Amino acid sequence: MSRIGNKVIVIPAGVSVEVNGATVTVKGPKGELVRSFNENITLEIAENEITVKRPNDTKEMKMLHGTTRALLANMVEGVSNGFSKALEMIGVGYRAQLQGTKLVLSVGKSHQDEVEAPENIKFVVATPTSIVVEGISKEAVGQTAAYIRSRRSPEPYKGKGIRYVGEYVRRKEGKTGK
């Protein structure tokens, strides 16, 4: 049984949280995030802490309680520190380059894949085979990184493709001849 919803969220210095009905606005040094939550979940802000409360102990409310607390904690973390996801490209001729806010991928296709950076997302290409997706929304960073990975996900025979840094790709044995 998870008790993540009962944990208090500490608001760091330089971050402000406003609650307007079911809409929460979190402002910080890196930017601003706005999100709507369920009306039944109440948020109490005291000094530099946010407490998430639920009206009753039904299964649905317990689920919403933990989810709301986790999303709110990620919003506070995002506007203060930000999130990043690193990817690496493995394969001959596989490379990435930036053209303005666009990421251009050469991954063994007859054409180049272009990925436009969504709002509040930034691409960093340190080397031609490494990509870092940075932003203030954990959800948007993860989705953008997953989209880039889907352009050429790692294949199990040679391990070529785009993968997260530290991701383990399960390898298969090739066909054996007669």
UniProtKB/Swiss-Prot annotation:
SUPFAM superfamilies: Ribosomal protein L6 (SSF56053)
Gene (UniProt): rplF
One MF annotation (Gene Ontology) recorded for this entry: rRNA binding
Protein name (record): Large ribosomal subunit protein uL6
Organism, scientific name: Lactococcus lactis subsp. cremoris (strain MG1363)
The organism's taxonomic lineage, starting at the top: Bacteria, Bacillati, Bacillota, Bacilli, Lactobacillales
Transit peptide among keywords: no
Signal peptide: none
Source organism superkingdom: Bacteria
Family: Belongs to the universal ribosomal protein uL6 family.
Cellular component aspect of the GO annotation: cytosolic large ribosomal subunit
